[in-house]
Amino acid sequence: MSKSNQKIASIEQLSNNEGIISALAFDQRGALKRMMAKHQTEEPTVAQIEQLKVLVAEELTQYASSILLDPEYGLPASDARNKDCGLLLAYEKTGYDVNAKGRLPDCLVEWSAKRLKEQGANAVKFLLYYDVDDAEEINIQKKAYIERIGSECVAEDIPFFLEVLTYDDNIPDNGSVEFAKVKPRKVNEAMKLFSEPRFNVDVLKVEVPVNMKYVEGFAEGEVVYTKEEAAQHFKNQDAATHLPYIYLSAGVSAELFQETLKFAHEAGAKFNGVLCGRATWSGAVQVYIEQGEDAAREWLRTTGFKNIDDLNKVLKDTATSWKQRK
């Protein structure tokens, strides 16, 4: 691995003793506001959002190797985390401009890699929407943008975690059969691209290469992939990068995410952990709004704990150390 000693030490702070990244993701901003808005008539307040993040940090970070937060609402939570829990901070603005073509990336204007590091981050995380089949005039802008962030992180000697979310502007529903058919190529080709040294990415945070809801044996309706085909997509994903890579939970249920990790492992994917968000804590949102802080704490200590504990047990059996990657 051609990483500096400082970067290696930082990634070690984000992973457990086995070299597995069992990270809790709570950098949601727009998605969190939408979740909260389902359960209350008024606009979610800054205080509500900050407190919910603090509750999750206080109750669950003792079971996570690290937590991903945003510097907009997550700094009180970063202070509340367990002392042994590493910190990733998000560098991107939430969402994207729906009126502009291409889902172009945008940094938080008040932040830099230097400032995130000064804030105590062990790594910088940036989310990029990427479609390998988009027009080159769009993709060249994205590639240049990621090069800039990569260079910034090299200058500050801080690990760069790149999160890639795939899409297709011609297929509005990425949960559809139509998108499921093109997803494996889009996910794996994007991984291959951003593994190139010019981007200076240290760890990839990625989607699983299939929509598990259309895999034979998991599907309730139409089947897009046989088990063998799905397994091959996971093998291809593992071969697409020499970098450590971790899976995001993409808002699926805790149970489905755990089953997905088992499937990936059996297929031969040597993934190095997870950044799991909503699959762990989403149920606390409604409880917090409707019943208050104490009830939310109780949910986190019971159901939330079970979600993260079950996930950790699955990771122990399925994930491999990032130190085994080149």
UniProtKB/Swiss-Prot annotation:
InterPro entries: Aldolase_TIM, DeoC/FbaB/LacD_aldolase, LacD_aldolase, Tag_1.6-dipho_adolase. GO terms for molecular function: 6-deoxy-6-sulfofructose-1-phosphate aldolase activity; tagatose-6-phosphate kinase activity; tagatose-bisphosphate aldolase activity. It is an enzyme of class 4 (lyase). Its EC number is 4.1.2.40. Coiled coil: none annotated. Signal peptide: none annotated. HAMAP family: LacD. This is Tagatose 1,6-diphosphate aldolase. It comes from Staphylococcus aureus (strain MSSA476).
